[in-house]
UniProtKB/Swiss-Prot annotation:
The gene is accD. The lineage of its organism: Bacteria, Bacillati, Bacillota, Bacilli, Bacillales. Disulfide bonds: none annotated. It is an enzyme of class 2 (transferase). NCBIfam families: accD (TIGR00515). It comes from Listeria monocytogenes serovar 1/2a (strain ATCC BAA-679 / EGD-e). It comes from the Bacteria. Residues 30-294 form the CoA carboxyltransferase N-terminal domain. Belongs to the AccD/PCCB family. This is Acetyl-coenzyme A carboxylase carboxyl transferase subunit beta.
Amino acid sequence: MLGDLFTKPKKRKYATIPSDGTKADVPEGIMTKCPECKKIMYTKELQKNLMVCNYCGFHHPIGAKARIDMLVDEGSFEEIDASLTTANPLGFEDYMDRIEKDKQKSGLNEAIVTGHATIGGNPLVIAVMDSRFRMASMGSVVGEKILRAVEDADKTNKPFVIFTASGGARMQEGMLSLMQMAKTSAAFKRFSNHGGLIITVMTHPTTGGVSASFASLGDYNFAEPGALIGFAGRRVIEQTVREELPEDFQTAEFLLKHGQLDDCISRLDLQNKLSFILSIHVKAPGVGGEVDGE
């Protein structure tokens, strides 16, 4: 009897009960989990809400054409320069393979879509960056499309509205990519000198060379809630200044609080806000002209 106290207990045996196959399979894509509040919702309901979480207001990333569809008047958008695409100017290894993959993934030829449209009946030239394509990095074609769009707005006396979302300059194009910062900024300056209206809307993420050039050169500088906006990464800055940064550093709310944005606008309110601003800045044909400073 005492010996039984020191014997090893027998391992329990477990039987595996086969599944009866009655568990319903949920089709892929029918539900979406919010990365912010972790709530799960129907994807269709999320889409109806312009990809803004019904529970916490988190703004999910959206593609350029989806953003245009939700903003402009139905049937008013006419794309320009859709065929422009990069030619790998530096012969960077496997660059074109990556470009082709992004074309298939996004359905775009480049990381930005530009064109003419109306919002609330107000004409404008619109440009929307798409982070699915090379993280919307700014290469020579992106810079050229922005330049042409701004020049179109100048010629037609229309306001220019641009939605930014970028990881910065495109490293595979080297100096040709970096020069787009000056090229686009100069185009904005010329247009501004001619009396043109520029509205920038910074979305998540707007970083690197884009944030350091044209992204904040608008007459109105807006951002979507929660958008990451900044030049260098948080860890790089902390290691450089040897200080711990605020938790909300480089967010749209932080920039608004420190006077670097005019407003932080929910995607749900953006169409009405833009329509109102455009309506009070309507410029009659032939009105305007250069101002001092060009």
